[in-house]
């Protein structure tokens, strides 16, 4: 899949690439607006040691956004995510208060004192090594931006400070760097909150206030430190579109603002302004293809305010909730007549996630016709402002985890209303492991770990195999805490002769017991008193180890391969059974694959 790649090498999350149609001849992808040095880009993605055919180094689908390895021998080009500042208040204010309206002189956008609020973020990243989960990858550095929102806080993109080990910030016109701390990351909305303790950093700074959602064709100004120079850059354009948009970093779908102002590598994290000098959002990604140009995306202030309110309410970020249903449009008259839907409205429930609260009140075949008394059209849209419509999922995104929604449905021709508690989606294969190391356990050289999107990306899709990829893309969790556990690799030793070539295979059972997650597997192994350890894999493959011989070989294997522990720290904790429904295991993983928006099927969509 081709994508426009500059010398700085745009970086793209694998989950951000969307296939628009069955034809691969019209490629397009979302990329984060961050810059990379030419030399750093060649090293940013280390190949798997077991990969027979290394992937192209500059393939944007195999790189993480916003990361630049520091090369002292070849000074990196500046990579910018911009930031605005606000003074540290003596009187503590609510973070959500900064969404209040504040009229600003339009000329102030070009005033030096206003631009001084923009700061540059310097981040050192140390990402986990998902192929060798007991260690981390070599550290690298990146630069970005953030803007001050008051009370000693900075706002930036989550991908700017992902897997951070050190964060520093520097104001415009200042040669000093100040240590910053990441307070919270919202991966799904690509927003992070930083704090700076130094009083000197905040001298002369003014807080930035958030404005309203703009209108179509409103002027917009994007400020930042993009590639091409060290000083601040200002670009202008107009609002082209406002709709539910795919967020590349979080693999989520939230409200987004499309603009035609140039957003280049380095603009991530920088504010976008209207003509009144109000911040209407945060620049975070661009849309690249051979047929388009100047399509940038801004996180609107409604999403920013939701993030801040969530953090303020809970003391942590709980994430955006979902309804947990797969929906189909009802545009066909015969389909509506068959379902006894009298009017041109509603969307059909095709599947309900077992882990969602909707599974208690909604059924396949129900037609959702309203959400909190707002009518849902047959195309899955609801009224939005004057003379506009927007995807039904927008209403769900306005809720918080734990909120209750009233759903109007038609079931077998009968109108009903049900209440559903909205909770964050449970991913069978997580898109991110934010903080900490991946879980793993090593048994006689057999390395077991949960399947995750970062692992798939690191291993390359070709080495993962079609079956695992299908489950990762299409399957849903049957219960909270469920994982797909795989045998990642085998560390060769005489105790595991004959199994050395096994890798990336799903383990289904241990001594006849179905595996629920990696912690469950570790628990079963610890409790085992049988003579043999029997692992059953996909495709009916089996591996048998003698228990006492395996235990005796463990220390030798760890020493030979320089591994500090046979398991990750989280697996040392007592095991808690995640299943609250004993019938959940009767349903096979992946037996009923479903589609999702990223695959490009326009008729079915998760909400």
Curated annotation (Swiss-Prot):
Keyword Coiled coil carried by entry: no
Compartments in which it is found: Plastid, Chloroplast thylakoid membrane
Keywords attached to this entry: Chloroplast, Hydrolase, Membrane, Plastid, Protease, Serine protease, Thylakoid, Transit peptide
EC number: 3.4.21.-
Domain PDZ: from-to ranges: 308-403
GO molecular function: serine-type endopeptidase activity
One BP term from GO: protein catabolic process
Gene3D superfamilies reported for this sequence: 2.30.42.10, 3.20.190.20, Trypsin-like serine proteases
Annotated segments matching region Disordered: 41-104
Keyword Chloroplast set for record: yes
Main location: plastid
Induction notes from the record: By high salt, desiccation and light stresses (at protein level).
Highest taxon above the source species: Eukaryota
GO cellular component entries: chloroplast; chloroplast envelope; chloroplast stroma; chloroplast stromal thylakoid; chloroplast thylakoid membrane; cytosol
Bias (Basic and acidic residues) ranges: 87-104
Membrane topology: Peripheral membrane protein
Annotated transmembrane regions: none
Active site (record annotation): 159, 190, 268
Region (Serine protease): 118-317
Family note: Belongs to the peptidase S1C family.
Physiological role: Serine protease that performs the primary cleavage of the photodamaged D1 protein in plant photosystem II.
Protein name: Protease Do-like 2, chloroplastic
Species per Swiss-Prot/TrEMBL record: Arabidopsis thaliana
């Amino acid at each position: 899949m081709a994508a426009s790649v500059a010398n700085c090498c745009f970086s793209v999350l694998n989950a951000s690439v969307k296939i628009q149609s069955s034809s691969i001849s019209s490629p397009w992808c979302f990329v984060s607006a961050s810059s990379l040095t030419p030399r750093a880009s060649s090293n940013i993605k280390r190949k798997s040691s077991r990969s027979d055919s290394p992937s192209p180094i500059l393939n944007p689908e195999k790189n993480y956004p916003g990361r630049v390895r520091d090369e002292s021998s070849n000074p990196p080009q500046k990579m910018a995510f911009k930031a605005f500042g606000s003074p540290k208040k003596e009187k503590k204010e609510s973070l959500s208060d900064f969404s209040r309206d504040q009229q600003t002189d339009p000329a102030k956008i070009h005033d030096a004192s206003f631009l001084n609020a923009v700061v540059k973020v310097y981040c050192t990243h140390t990402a986990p090594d998902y192929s060798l989960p007991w260690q981390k990858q070599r550290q690298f550095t990146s630069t970005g931006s953030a803007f001050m929102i008051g009370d000693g806080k900075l706002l930036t993109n989550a991908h700017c400070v992902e897997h951070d080990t050190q964060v520093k910030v520097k104001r415009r016109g200042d040669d000093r760097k100040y240590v910053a701390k990441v307070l919270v990351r919202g991966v799904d909305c690509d927003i992070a909150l930083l704090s700076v303790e130094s009083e000197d950093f905040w001298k002369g700074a003014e807080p930035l206030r958030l404005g309203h959602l703009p209108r179509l064709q409103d002027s917009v100004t994007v400020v930042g430190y993009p590639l091409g120079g060290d000083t601040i850059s200002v670009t202008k354009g107009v609002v082209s579109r406002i709709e539910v948009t795919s967020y590349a970093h979080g693999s989520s779908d939230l409200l987004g603002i499309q603009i035609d102002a140039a957003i280049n590598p380095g603009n991530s994290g920088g504010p976008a302004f209207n003509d009144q000098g109000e911040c209407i959002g945060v620049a975070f990604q661009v849309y690249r293809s051979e047929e388009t140009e100047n399509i940038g995306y801004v996180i609107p202030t409604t999403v920013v305010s939701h993030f801040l309110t969530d953090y303020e309410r809970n003391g942590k970020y709980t994430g955006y909730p979902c309804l947990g249903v797969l929906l189909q449009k009802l545009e066909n008259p015969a389909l509506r007549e068959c379902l006894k839907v009298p009017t041109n409205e509603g969307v059909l429930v095709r599947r309900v996630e077992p882990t969602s609260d909707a599974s208690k009140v909604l059924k396949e075949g129900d037609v959702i016709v309203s959400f909190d008394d707002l009518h849902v059209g047959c195309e899955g849209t609801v009224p939005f402002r004057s003379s506009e419509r927007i995807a039904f999922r927008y209403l769900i995104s306005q809720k918080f985890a734990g909120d209750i929604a009233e759903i109007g449905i038609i079931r077998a021709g009968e109108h009903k209303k049900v209440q559903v508690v909205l909770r964050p989606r449970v991913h069978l294969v997580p898109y991110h492991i934010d903080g900490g190391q991946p879980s793993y356990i090593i048994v006689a050289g057999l390395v077991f770990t949960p399947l995750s999107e970062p692992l798939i990306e690191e291993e390359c899709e070709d080495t993962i195999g079609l079956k695992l990829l299908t489950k990762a893309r299409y399957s849903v969790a049957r219960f909270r805490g469920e994982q797909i556990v795989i045998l990642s690799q085998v560390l060769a030793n005489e105790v595991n002769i004959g199994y050395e070539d096994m890798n990336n295979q799903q383990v289904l059972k241990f001594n006849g017991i179905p595996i629920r997650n990696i912690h469950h597997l570790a628990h079963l192994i610890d409790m085992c008193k049988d003579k043999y350890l029997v692992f059953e894999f996909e495709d009916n493959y089996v591996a048998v180890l003698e228990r006492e011989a395996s235990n005796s070989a463990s220390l030798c294997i760890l020493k030979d391969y320089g591994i500090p522990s046979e398991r990750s720290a989280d697996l040392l904790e007592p095991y808690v059974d995640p299943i609250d429904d004993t019938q959940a295991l009767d349903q096979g993983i992946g037996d009923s694959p479903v589609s999702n928006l990223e695959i490009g099927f326009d008729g079915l969509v998760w909400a």
